[in-house]
């Protein structure tokens, strides 16, 4: 993962965190990445964590196959694991990491929040819902042409 910085009117790429494990064909090595995260922070249930990664990856693949990505060339799964990587470096708990991995799938309305609640529990669903509410509040106070954290108009109406 790299972030752009501007120095003397020139854009440079700066590495901001360690890359995640990849397979030979350029896909995320979920097992390797789970092990990498487990070496950085405590995972209460590595199987649940792995399942969240697999679910997010499958949802992302379906979006790609249906040409329904949120932006050309984007991967909601990879962005989700990058967010989870940041949270792992901050030593947040597993529920927070799982919520980060799954957030974009819910935000992009590829999976209902209720499905996440059933499969991953109230805490994960509550965290995702809370982030959606914060994004909606931010949008109300600072309206932009684009979405903030991907909230939809319906989410804004719910907060109002």
Give the ranges of each region predicted by the language model.
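Active-site helical microenvironments for divalent-metal-assisted chemistry
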Residues: 1-160
């Amino acid at each position: 993962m790299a972030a752009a910085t501007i120095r003397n009117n020139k854009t440079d790429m700066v590495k901001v965190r360690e890359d995640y494990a990849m397979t030979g064909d350029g896909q995320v090595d979920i097992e390797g990445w789970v092990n990498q995260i487990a070496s950085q922070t405590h995972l209460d249930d590595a199987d649940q964590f792995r399942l969240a990664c697999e679910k997010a990856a499958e949802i992302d693949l379906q979006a790609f196959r249906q040409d329904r990505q949120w932006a050309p060339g984007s991967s909601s799964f990879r962005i989700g694991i990058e967010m989870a990587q940041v949270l792992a470096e901050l030593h947040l708990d597993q529920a927070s990491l799982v919520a980060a991995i799954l957030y974009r799938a819910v935000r992009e309305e590829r999976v209902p929040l209720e499905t996440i609640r059933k499969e991953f529990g109230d805490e994960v669903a509550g965290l995702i819902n809370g982030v959606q509410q914060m994004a909606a509040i931010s949008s109300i106070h600072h309206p932009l042409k684009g979405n903030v954290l991907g909230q939809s108009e319906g989410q804004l109406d719910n907060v109002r």
